[in-house]
């Protein structure tokens, strides 16, 4: 049995599962516009209970089956498909809701990735998978300082350092998962401090040695530029 743990809920830094309620304890996940209007929960308490249950089920599933599935491509308006415009300019709540609609059948649930799942995926890639560097992803991600050009698509060679469609380059993948490193930031369910959710992986505008696949940071869940 593998023991999987994360930082303790109700602490002030990186942690999950937990709510983000602002320094006044009345914002973000306690704002009805978000927890009810967008996510459909009756109360912040119901939202917290759902997060706790989902997290426990995720951990139990990993321990039982030895792993989990990740969408092969970044999220687009059409879902998880190749060759689509990455879905950006949406806040955390909108993307969290979108992630719950991606299951192919009623026997499968789709969720936004948890922080621990992101870390486990990076750990697998660096140690057991294609053994790519997760602390400097300039050689396999779409960053501002990545090396060389991307693959040719539709007869045109496009350089690193600009946003591309999902699954654009065969060089930008690890274990058949595209754009874990760069292209666009990825939101997770991990909470940060009193006012943030965590995003990971860097983007096309970031240095891949400073913002690699393993990088994570907290930002306002109401922001919409990721």
What are these regions (language model features)?
Residues 89-103, 108-113, 171, 194-226:
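Disulfide-stabilized, aromatic/cysteine-rich ligand-recognition loop
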Residues 182-190:
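Active-site-proximal beta-strands of protease catalytic cores
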Residues 179-180, 225:
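Residue-level recognition of short, solvent-exposed, well-ordered loop/turn junctions
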């Amino acid at each position: 049995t593998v023991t999987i743990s994360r930082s303790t809920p109700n602490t002030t830094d990186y942690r999950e599962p937990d709510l983000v309620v602002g320094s006044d304890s009345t914002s973000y996940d306690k704002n009805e516009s978000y927890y009810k209007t967008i996510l459909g929960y009756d109360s912040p308490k119901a939202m917290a209970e759902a997060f706790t249950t989902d997290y426990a089920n995720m951990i139990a599933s990993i321990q039982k089956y030895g792993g989990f599935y990740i969408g092969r491509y970044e999220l687009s308006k059409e879902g998880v498909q190749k060759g689509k415009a990455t879905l950006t300019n949406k806040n955390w709540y909108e993307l969290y809701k979108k992630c719950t609609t991606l299951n192919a059948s009623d026997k499968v649930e789709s969720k936004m990735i948890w922080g621990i799942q992101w870390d486990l995926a990076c750990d697998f890639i660096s140690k057991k998978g294609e053994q790519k560097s997760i602390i400097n992803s300039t050689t396999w991600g779409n960053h501002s300082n990545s090396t060389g050009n991307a693959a040719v698509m539709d007869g045109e060679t496009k350089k690193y350092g600009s946003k591309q469609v999902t699954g654009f380059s065969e060089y930008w993948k690890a274990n058949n998962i595209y754009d874990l490193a760069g292209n666009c930031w990825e939101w997770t369910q991990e909470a940060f401090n009193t006012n943030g959710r965590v995003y990971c992986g860097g983007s096309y505008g970031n240095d891949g040695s400073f913002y690699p696949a393993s990088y994570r940071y907290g930002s306002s869940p109401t922001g919409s530029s990721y």
